[in-house]
Each structure stands twice: as structure tokens, then as C-alpha cells.
Amino acid sequence: MKALLDLFKQVQQEEVFDAIKIGLASPDKIRSWSFGEVKKPETINYRTFKPERDGLFCAKIFGPIKDYECLCGKYKRLKHRGVICEKCGVEVTLAKVRRERMGHIELASPVAHIWFLKSLPSRLGMVLDMTLRDIERVLYFEAYVVIEPGMTPLKARQIMTEEDYYNKVEEYGDEFRAEMGAEGVRELLRAINIDEQVETLRTELKNTGSEAKIKKYAKRLKVLEAFQRSGIKPEWMILEVLPVLPPELRPLVPLDGGRFATSDLNDLYRRVINRNNRLKRLLELKAPEIIVRNEKRMLQEAVDSLLDNGRRGKAMTGANKRPLKSLADMIKGKGGRFRQNLLGKRVDYSGRSVIVVGPTLKLHQCGLPKLMALELFKPFIFNKLEVMGVATTIKAAKKEVENQTAVVWDILEEVIREHPVMLNRAPTLHRLGIQAFEPVLIEGKAIQLHPLVCAAFNADFDGDQMAVHVPLSLEAQMEARTLMLASNNVLFPANGDPSIVPSQDIVLGLYYATREAVNGKGEGLSFTGVSEVIRAYENKEVELASRVNVRITEMVHNEDTSEGAPPFVPKISLYATTVGRAILSEILPHGLPFSVLNKPLKKKEISRLINTAFRKCGLRATVVFADQLMQSGFRLATRAGISICVDDMLVPPQKETIVGDAAKKVKEYDRQYMSGLVTAQERYNNVVDIWSATSEAVGKAMMEQLSTEPVTDRDGKETRQESFNSIYMMADSGARGSAVQIRQLAGMRGLMAKPDGSIIETPITANFREGLNVLQYFISTHGARKGLADTALKTANSGYLTRRLVDVTQDLVVVEDDCGTSNGVAMKALVEGGEVVEALRDRILGRVAVADVVNPETQETVYESGTLLDETAVEEIERLGIDEVRVRTPLTCETRYGLCAACYGRDLGRGSLVNVGEAVGVIAAQSIGEPGTQLTMRTFHIGGAASRAAVASSVEAKSNGIVRFTATMRYVTNAKGEQIVISRSGEAMITDDFGRERERHKVPYGATLLQLDGVTIKAGTQLATWDPLTRPIITEYGGTVKFENVEEGVTVAKQIDDVTGLSTLVVIDVKRRGSQASKSVRPQVKLLDANGDEVKIPGTEHAVQIGFQVGALITVKDGQQVQVGEVLARIPTEAQKTRDITGGLPRVAELFEARSPKDAGILAEVTGTTSFGKDTKGKQRLVITDLEGNQHEFLIAKEKQVLVHDAQVVNKGEMIVDGPADPHDILRLQGIEALSRYIVDEVQDVYRLQGVKINDKHIEVIVRQMLRRVQITDNGDTRFIPGEQVERSDMLDENDRMIAEDKRPASYDNVLLGITKASLSTDSFISAASFQETTRVLTEAAIMGKRDDLRGLKENVIVGRLIPAGTGLAFHKARKAKESSDRERFDQIAAEEAFDFGTPSAPAEEPQQHPAAE
């Protein structure tokens, strides 16, 4: 019977396609889609519920309501398939054709498509070269447009009001034609000759010089060329026929109580049909023009609402006063077609439940409740029951399963064996959020999860839920097992660290077991082996922490690598260790020495241990080891019985004295402030500093007391050992809590921040053990509340950032092994403030060297170019003291659509070179986005305690060596003989004997140098000191002070401190100055020599002038004698706000969005010499004269700080005016490498502040995508337009073609796009439309007649194909190869056949002409 039924099934052919094209539909095309015209607004008959004929649900047009049954019931059953009933006109076929058959409405008057009218920039306006307002006035019948001026002086496309029109008609009669409404616009569009227009525009573009015109012409040219290329006629933007959506896609559902629920589209269509029919009738009746015109306008508005309600005028509303949901609303936004249905589908064979911990599971297992498994694996069970003959039909099998008979449970066990399931925890922030496990059947209703995978899922057991998905096909099961099994994903793709690191109780247990105690029971005993130790421990002869000597057998790598030799050989050594460590040595994998365990295991150590195991012993051994570590950790933690009590929080006895001293200091500052020696701001800064330091000191005293305890050793001597205090052990091991939190429990809570980030100067001197008083508690609530509010707000921001990142990188896949480029970037250790923030080894690990790595001492090549630098290589490089290595980077990869494996380097989640097909773009986006949400959630952990680093006020050397100053360092010697720095960008370096840089420190303007160039110093020597709370203005010349424009009440204000009564002069902000004249002047100082002449800058005719910035406190008086290096004014630095990640997320977003910062610093456009020109009103003029003698001027606001002085040589791209850097300038002036370094370092700074590790290459991948487009500067012979932005790969392809044809290629500039803009300007319109601004993207694509080659992942998910990554990439490659080989074979056969029949091989279309026939 089944075979019989299959006979009648319609053959459904799966379409294989490689691209999707979008365009405008011509009226004929729309009619060809349609199955009939919808003439009536009726939907269904309210009594019979049958659709009305010719109405919106008409069965004749759209197909039958029931399968194989016509409406009147004359033809039923399959045998009449394809018959059209003569009575009701319905074709007998499947009812589901009502989902695909369209209808149409013939409009009585043409109507403009609102997308092409109102979606900015207006496409109609561009094609017609008219303004949007004018076109709108014509379309909505408020004005006439001239179509054919004839012999009159009128111009085509001229707009006239009705009055004008009647006057002109009286004047010229019917010599000209003007129209209103869409008919007029359609006529104009028809009249356009595109080819002619394109030619004229191209010539105009070449001849015009005005920027505005070039821009305008280029835009119009682009649109017209698009029409020309795609073969779309402009008049199709005006609709004559309106397609009607199939009825099943806009259903009408009867509710109980005789009411109906309907899709808004039906309402919108009804309005269109009603107005259209009324208009038809009015036209037949030859109604007065004004009535017809009104009806046409109403029709236009009805169609507008149907296509995009609310885009123009007020949105049409339904009965409930809500705007109706139009066709455009159906596809855009989070709930639209793209994001709701195409990118996010719900799937079958899935379930969800609460998770509980499963400590007995192996890493690759999960506990699945029996009832869930029964439901999830139903089809498999049915199949087995039939095969085994327990049930004969599916129905019988169903009954068996429902009754849950014994045989069903046996079958379930069998079905589940070796059939992995996938577990997912929302939010899935990176690829480890979904992993595959082998299910183990358990009782109860909760899923059991292995404790070690919790870190990857970010799961805890406080009520989290997880979803289970069953991979059905064999391929899916295979992929789940090989690629997604939890035991195959032990490294984080973000940084290559192990993800299966124990936490909390496991760490505590291992730490407790590996600690050592002085004079423990059985100390000093010797044992012949581990089994003896265990026996002694079980008989309570020794304690876990006792120091003992044990003979331990290690399995080490065999030196003998000949065939048949075992990989590991035993090695026996005697170790001084502790009982706990000896017991743990049992689980050590082969190939690891005991020394890795012979120390207290803290969380970091355990992570390092697992990492070492992975690198040395491979994946399998590591997974087994991690599992055993976990088992031991839990067991030992239970044995340890660590708990907390109030007495564990030891408050240091010195606390009172420390706090008392601080209070005295604060009082002293108050006194100084009262007597006017310091400003309010300085006092505040100092008070905050004192309390910060006090908080630190109390914390330190507390930690000292907590971390050690007095003991008596074996010889009866008093000594101190590391404490066994429970709280200390928890924090020290990294199990829970931190020093900061303990400080709040037992030290002092310290300073708190207000919600705006400023610090409250009264600290909380109490701690939680002593308890807070009401005021202290109240101050604390600020931080806690802010934390919660931040969390709520920022989770959304972080998710949005991830979404943008994924969107910009989703089409970046590794597609080949090596692109063969010789470009790369130079990597150095990252040094900040003299500290190595990131060592060179960490930056180059897993990269491919692009140049030979050479030993600096012997000049021999250590690693050839093209080597993948692994752990051994980077250790060797570090040992040799090489401080710079050039490596490949995704930025310079020359693969056209994607990346090559060599430029990407190691796949961090697998630990080997990346495979072809890896979706590295998405991995990069996830790696950057995932911690984003953690950053957001990490604000309130410290409970808002203001952790403010006391500001740096000096630099000291970290290593021995020789002091070297950079070329930019300049200093003068003052009257006291001190060296005062007067350069803005000077740096001091410490070099070793080989001249290799060991550290580098920025020395700020105004610092006092304590060591000079070339001095040999020891580590710890101070190099320079400065006042951290003010920025000085220093004179480089001596003389008598002469003020200019320093007028009280005009440019400066006398600030009399209301407390102290002392006065200082402060430069007033420009915005607050009264008169216009005073806004343009700048208070400054000139110096006079002994004769009263102005002091000149040596070698020039310019007088020395030193300007005061806004906010400067002037410390000298007019007529005062000053010496070289003396301070003229001080600028107080702002009170620092606490650094919270609040700055973090937005900072990352603004870097990736490539926003220009406000008040950006100015970079030198050229290399040359600086000089100052004549100042204008509010600006100073800086001139750079380049090497050819050309002058480049910069106008700089007076309050800005210029970093260069007269006659200084600057290099192109050097910062000349202080301020945050603009990434666009960096790209333009310093190039791609500098830009990438800037973005990578800035993003890393934010994450490093939070202690988050992300590999640089992820950020580089994103920067590559931001540089995806180029701007054409000279189009050569290509099809591009100058100034146009095009995809880099398109441009390279086009240039290759030009070179092949011996034509001129185009030249271009790099352009940096923000991630949102880059996503929207991608080649794939499907991907862009599903991201943001759907309407705009689709409008543009339709006009261009764009073709989407389905290169990215997103497009393929949307059209439902396998994604071109991983196994999907291989599938598509194989498919394409087969297609091309089939084509070749086909051509070959065709050629052979033609040859066999003896037909002439000439093409048949053109008959061969004999010369004689002419």
C-alpha cells in the first residue's frame, strides 16, 4: 500500500543553486506569477466559512481548501488529480498549494513603490534627478510635473502648482504636457535613456572640479549604471500590478465564539482592493477630476501602507488602534522573517531540564533522565521494536513505549549506547556553549553534568537549565562524536588555555593535600614506595601535610626511539615531599615528572599542570588525568573538612594605630587647606591618596597576620609557617574569594565610589567582622546598587557587540593552506610603564614565522621562515634573548575570499595548525564577545569598594643595565641644579650589555631626572620623579616675566578660596568669557632680558611666548625674575574616577566601530620642520615645512596642548597636538600595521584590566574585516568610479583582469570601516539584510540587481544549505568539482557525437558564406 501511495506523490526536485539574485519585477513578471486576479475585498462567507469567489481567499485562484477536493464537492479523491471543476473552477490538488500560489490586483492607476521613493537616499529622486519633496508633491497630487515642454519655454521635469498649470494652459494651450501622480512620474522614467545619461555623466565627472558635484554625479552614476548592468527598467519602480501573497501566509483563523483572528495583511489588502474598485467605477462614470484625483491619492496611500506601513505619514491602524503590520514589518527586526524564522529555528528531538552535578561521570558523559531519553529517542525505539518483532506496527510499538514495558527499557539502553547527545546552556556565548556527551541513563528528572565542563558552559547548579539535542543522521552523530565531544574540547578557543580546569572544592581539596606543615605527625620518615605511604596514612601514622622521603617511580619518555622500544620507561628517584603529594603521584600520566606535583597546587598551578599534560602527553592522557584530579580533589576536600568561622577573620592589632595616623595626616591637610597652601582639589586628591594607602597598609598587616602562624618545629624551636587558616587557604588556593574580599572581612573596607565614579573621601574604616554603622552601611549601598544596575544594562550591550562582531566576520573561513605572502608584522614584548605586560613568547606562540629567526649573537638561523612556532620554539627564542620576531598575520593574508592556514597559525582550541574549513571569523567574534558579558557581570563583586591605584609619581629601574634616553628626550637644568624634562614624548630605556632593550619608561613633561644618559645602574634605582597631581608649565629660558592678555575678570579670574581667603589667578574657560574679543586672546608670558628686550628663541626672530591653558593656576607674578626650568603655572589633574569596566565595553565598541574620538589628537601629515605662523581668532597656526619646501598648515584651538616646539623635526604620523588618537588618521598616515597595533593594544588594555586573556589574532581577524573595503582614487580603465568604495577582493580581481588585458588598473586607498558599517556593506545582500536596516539593504540590492554568491555562513543558513565551513566546505568543494567534471564529460560526449555524425563542426547559427556568394 505504501508503495502505491508513493506512486502518486509529486516528484519534488531539490534545486541545486550556487547564487541568489534579486531584482525588480516587471508588471508582466508579476502577472506570470499570478493564478488569477483578486477582484473583491471579501474573504470568507461568514455562514459556510467557504472562501468567496474572486476574493482574497478564493479557492479558484489559490487552490483547494482540502487535499484533492474541489470547493463544491463534485470531485473528491486522488483519482481526479489535476481536474478543474467546471462548477466552482477549483483545481483538484494538494491544499498546500495555497502556500505558494500568488494572485494579483490590476491597479486602475499606477502607484509608486514606497521603498524606492522614501528609503533614503531616494532612488526615484536619483534616477530622475529631482528632489524627494518635488516627487512626493507630484505623486500625492499636490503639483504637476512637465513631461513634454514641446515648443514652450517650460523645462521638462519642472514642477508647477495647480494655479500655475491653469495659467500655462491658458497661455500655451495644448503645446505642452504636464501630468500629476504616478502616471506622470512613470512617463518621465520611461523617457530616460540610460546609456546616454551614463555617457554624459562620465564626461561631466571628468570635467568638473567641484567636490559637491563629483559626489552627486558619482552617486547618480552608480544607480544608473546598476540599472544598465542589471537590465532592470526604471519604470518598474512604479507598480501597475500588485502581487497578492498566498492566503496560507496571511491566514484567517476562526476563534471560538464566532470571531476571527486575521493577519493584518488582509486588512491592508482589503483597503487596497476597495479603493481600487471605487477608482475603477469613478473612471467608468467619468467622475470629476478632483474626485478621481482624491481616490488615486488614497489608492497610493493604501499601497504604501501595505508595503511599509508608517514610512510616510500616519500609520494605518486596525480596530485596536495599533498600527497594522505591513509586508516590510514582517521581514525586519528581531521578530521578523530573517532573524526569527530563518536564522533561529526551533528544532525537534530536543528537551530541557534543570542540571545537577554528576561527580561520578567521566568527562565525556552526561546523565540523562530515563523519561527524557525515552521521549527523545522514540523513533529509534519504534524501529528496534519492529525489527525485533515485539511490535508489528508503529501503533503497536507506540503502545509498548507508552506502557513502559521492561523490553522498552532494554531497547532504550541499546539505542542510547554510543549515540552522543548535544547539551547546550543559554546564553551560548562561544562554541564551548554546545558540547556533545554520551548519555548515561539515570533516575530522576534532572540532567547530570560533569563538574569540569562547567567552566566552559559558565554553568552552576543554582537552578540553571540546559537543553538536550539529539543528532539524528549518521553523519551528524559522527561529527558530534569527533568534533564536539566534551573530551575533544579541552582548550578555550580564545586563548588556548585548558577549559577543564578544576575550581572551588576540587582546588581546595588538592591544595589542602599538597600543603606542607612543620612538625607534622611522622615528619622525616622514609618510605620505599607510594603504597607504603598510603598504608601509613590509613593507619594514622602520618598526616597529609607531613614532610617525608619517598621513592617514587616515574614513567619518563624513552630515549631509545628504535622500533619495538616502549614509549615510556620507569625511572626511580627519592623525593623529599609530603604524604599528600606522594599519594597524588599515583594518578600522574606517563611522561610527566613528579616535580610538577611536588609543590602546593593552587588554581593557577593546576591549570599549568593540565596544560603541560596536554602538550607533553596528548589529549587522551590529559582527559583521564583531569578526571582523576577531580575525583581526588572532591575526596580530599571532604576529608579536609575546611569550614569558616568568625574567629578565622583575624583583625590586625596594628589597625587602630594605622587608621589613627592617617586621620592625623588628613587633619594636617585640612589645616594646610585652611591656611591656603593647597587648593581644594589638591587637598581632595591627597586625602584620597592617604586613605588608599591606609587601606593597603591595613590590608597588608591583616594578610601578614593571616598568612602565617607560629609553630614549634621538631627541635623545639619557635618558627612561623604558612597558615592553615580556612579563609586564608580558600583565597590562597584560588578556590573562592580574593585578598580584596578578605580585606573587607577583616581589614578595613576602605574608600567607596559614588554612582558617578568619583570617590567619597570619607572611608569606611570598619570591616564586616566588626560591623558597619548606619552611615557606613549607607555609603556602601551606592556600590552594590550600581553593580546590579550595570549588570542589567550591560548584558544587553555586550550581546549586541557580539552580534555585530559575528556579523562582520561570519564569512571569514580558512580556505587554503598557504597564500604565499611574504608580509607580516614584527612582534615585540609588550612593555607598559617599565613592566613587561605580555612576554614575546606569549605573543608569537602558535604563529608562523615570516622571516628567518636569527640568533643575535652567532647570526645563525634558528628557525626558517614558514615554521609554526610551538612551545619549544618560543622557549628557545626567549632563551636566546631574541626580542623581535616577524610573524604572519591575518591582516596581510592575500587569500581573496577567506584566510589561509599559515597566516592564521595555530587553532587555539585544538593546539595544532588550523584546519582548512575552520570558521575563524566566528571564533574570533565569540572570543572577543564572550568575556564582554563577563566583564559586564563582574562589576559588583568587589561590592563597589574603590580600588584606586595610588598614582605613579616616579619610575624606577626593574633590572640592572645602562640608562639610555630616546632621541625625543629634552631637559634643562634649573637653579637648584636639577634636570627638568621639557619634552612631551621622552622615554628612558634600560639596555643590557649587548644593547638589547630590557625595559622602557615614559618620562612625563616636568619630571625631575635623577639619572642621566649612559649611566650604569642597579635594579631598583629611581630614574625620575614628578608631582602626579598637577601638570606644570615650565620655562626653558630665564628672564623677567611680562604678562600678555592676563587681565583679571577677562581671561583670568582671581580665585579667593572661601575657606582660606588666599587668592590665585586661574585662566578662565573660553566658553565662560564675557566679551567676543576676550574669547580669541590667549593669556601668555613673554620674557625680557636685562635690557628690557624680548628674549628670542635662539636662531630665530621669534620671541619666546609661553601660553597658559584653560584651568592653569599661574604661580608667578608680573615682573618677577625667573630662572631656566622654573614653574610658571600648574594645571591640577582631575580627581581620578575609579576604573570600572563601564569604560571597558563602550571603549571596545568604539574601537571596533572606528569612531573618531572627540578632541582627537592631530598627527603630522608630512615629515618636515615645524614653525608657528600668525595666530587667528581662536586658533594658533602650526606650519610644517616638508623636505621639498612645501608648507602644510594646521589650525589648532588655543586651549589645546601642542606637543612640538619651534623648529622641531617631526615624522609623518607623529602626534603634534595632544589628544586621543583617531584610528582613521593612523591608517592614513602610518599604515595598516600601525593601525592594527593600535587597535589590538587598546582592546587588549581593556580586557587585561579585567584579567581576561584573548589572543591577538582574534582582534586582528576583526581588523582585517574592518579593512575589507578600499576607496578608488584613480579608476584607470576599470568599471569603478573615483571615490567609490568597493570590496578589496573585487578590486583585486578587476585589476588582475586589467593587467591581463594590458589596460590600466585602478589605484586605491585603504579605508577603515566600523563593524556595523562593514557588515552592511558586505557583498552578500542576504547577510546584510538580516543584520540591520533591512529595507535599505533590500532596496539597494533590488535596484543593483545584486547577486549573492552565498559565500558566508549566514546566507547559507538562511537559504537552508550546508554552511561552507568545516565538513560543509568539503561538501561544497566536492559538489563543485563533480559539477565541473560532469560538464567536461558532457562536452566531450557532445563533441564525440558530433564527430560521429559527420556534422560540420562550425556553429549552426551562422551559415558559412562562400566568398563567391558576395
From Swiss-Prot:
Positions bound to Zn(2+) 1: 70, 72, 85, 88
Give the GO biological process terms.
DNA-templated transcription
Cite the residue spans of the region called Disordered. Answer: 1391-1414
* SUPFAM superfamilies for this protein: beta and beta-prime subunits of DNA dependent RNA-polymerase
In the Enzyme Commission scheme, what number(s) does this protein have?
A: 2.7.7.6
UniProt keyword terms in alphabetical order: DNA-directed RNA polymerase, Magnesium, Metal-binding, Nucleotidyltransferase, Transcription, Transferase, Zinc
**InterPro entries listed in its UniProt record:** DNA-dir_RpoC_beta_prime, DNA-dir_RpoC_beta_prime_bact, RNA_pol_asu, RNA_pol_N, RNA_pol_Rpb1_1, RNA_pol_Rpb1_3, RNA_pol_Rpb1_3_sf, RNA_pol_Rpb1_4
- What does the record's cofactor remark say about binding? Binds 1 Mg(2+) ion per subunit.
Q: Return the protein name.
A: DNA-directed RNA polymerase subunit beta'
Protein's organism: Burkholderia lata (strain ATCC 17760 / DSM 23089 / LMG 22485 / NCIMB 9086 / R18194 / 383)
Q: What is the lineage of its organism?
A: Bacteria, Pseudomonadati, Pseudomonadota, Betaproteobacteria, Burkholderiales
In the UniProt record, what gene is named as encoding this protein? rpoC
